[in-house]
């Protein structure tokens, strides 16, 4: 009996959206993605206690300055969790830059280089790592610099076509357009509270981005993210990659209903348009109130969880 998860693997690279090692072992994804919220959640698991202790010891040995120690411990913990995950997945781990740097190109570049250096010191090559960066104009510019240095990036919190287009034009390795958070916004801001999967505004957004990339021959990988239900996932079967939380991986594994491929580009590849300028990017992105609100909200939420993680680490120093 073929499960929907097995069927999905035949048309899409399945990625686990979690820092939980036990869940990753169970569902055997190709890659895994983490973010500050997932790192915070994983840090409460007992098996991660030694990783926290090691990160703090590393930070204390590296600097006598308390502020710097905290920064170093955060970075080392994120990498330590990534290293554990890389023992299980055959592909890549996505590790996220501090969301509070989302509007600072140079600081984002420097943080990414530091995270990569920590992985390299542990014997992990660049081709097993993706640096996650919020899809702000400044974040996209940082990714453009990093890609030229051989550091592949995963541009996250992506809600608008302008963000997707700017990422492709910058030569970004991979984007994570969000599905569920778009649905959340439309439910909260319209009278319609229920959507069939094919009418889900998040599904429609990712489908349009996928088709746009294929239509113009962009190599940037499209990895749908942030799912609220299995219907959103099955409606995007055929997308380059999908990053899925363990609870939804479980549902897919327990369902044997036939899965039909929904995304597959057929047609001629067109000449690429001129890249967006900064002013064009902001005009187009800001024309979409959902994208503006959800990008800002996502950055805020990740920053809050980063601060909670810092508080937890400080208590252990």
Curated annotation (Swiss-Prot):
Query: Where does the protein principally reside?
Result: cytoplasm
Its recorded reaction(s) are: D-sedoheptulose 7-phosphate + D-glyceraldehyde 3-phosphate = D-erythrose 4-phosphate + beta-D-fructose 6-phosphate
Matching entries from Pfam families are given as:
TAL_FSA
SS bond partners:
none
GO molecular function annotation: transaldolase activity
- Identify the pathway: Carbohydrate degradation; pentose phosphate pathway; D-glyceraldehyde 3-phosphate and beta-D-fructose 6-phosphate from D-ribose 5-phosphate and D-xylulose 5-phosphate (non-oxidative stage): step 2/3
- Kindly state one GO CC term assigned in the UniProt record: cytosol
List this protein's GO terms for biological process.
Answer: carbohydrate metabolic process; pentose-phosphate shunt
Its subcellular locations are: Cytoplasm
Gene3D superfamilies in UniProt: Aldolase class I
Give the EC number(s) listed in the UniProt record: 2.2.1.2
Subunit structure and binding partners: Homodimer.
Q: Which NCBIfam families match?
A: PRK12346.1, talAB
Function description = Transaldolase is important for the balance of metabolites in the pentose-phosphate pathway.
Report the protein name in the record. Transaldolase
- Per the UniProt entry, what species is this protein from, by scientific name? Histophilus somni (strain 2336)
């Amino acid at each position: 009996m073929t499960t929907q998860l097995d069927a999905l693997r035949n048309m899409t690279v399945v990625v686990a959206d979690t820092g939980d090692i036990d869940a990753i072992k169970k569902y055997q994804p190709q890659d895994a993605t983490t973010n500050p919220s997932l790192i915070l959640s994983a840090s409460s698991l007992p098996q991660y206690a030694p990783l926290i202790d090691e990160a703090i010891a590393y930070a204390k040995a590296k600097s006598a300055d308390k502020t710097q120690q905290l920064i170093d411990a955060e970075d080392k913990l994120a990498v330590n969790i990534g290293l554990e995950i890389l023992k299980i997945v055959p592909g890549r781990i996505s590790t996220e830059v501090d969301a509070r740097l989302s509007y600072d190109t140079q600081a984002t570049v420097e943080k990414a280089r530091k995270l990569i250096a920590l992985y390299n010191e542990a014997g992990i090559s660049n081709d097993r790592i993706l640096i996650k960066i919020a899809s702000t104009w400044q974040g996209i510019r940082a990714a453009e610099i990093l890609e030229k240095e051989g550091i592949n990036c995963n541009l996250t919190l992506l809600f608008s076509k302008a963000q997707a287009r700017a990422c492709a034009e910058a030569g970004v390795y991979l984007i994570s357009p969000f599905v569920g958070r778009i649905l959340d916004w439309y439910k909260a801001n319209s009278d319609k509270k229920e959507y069939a999967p094919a009418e889900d505004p998040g599904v429609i957004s990712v489908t349009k981005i996928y088709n746009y990339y294929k239509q113009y021959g962009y190599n940037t990988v499209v990895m749908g993210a942030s799912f609220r239900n299995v219907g959103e996932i099955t409606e995007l079967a055929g997308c380059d990659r999908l990053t899925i939380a363990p609870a939804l991986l479980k549902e897919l594994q327990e369902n044997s209903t036939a899965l039909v491929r929904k995304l597959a580009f057929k047609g001629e590849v067109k000449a690429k348009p001129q890249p967006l300028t900064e002013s064009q990017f902001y005009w187009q992105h800001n024309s979409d109130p959902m994208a503006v609100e959800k990008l800002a909200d996502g950055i805020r939420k990740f920053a809050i969880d980063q601060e909670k993680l810092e508080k937890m680490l400080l208590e252990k120093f």
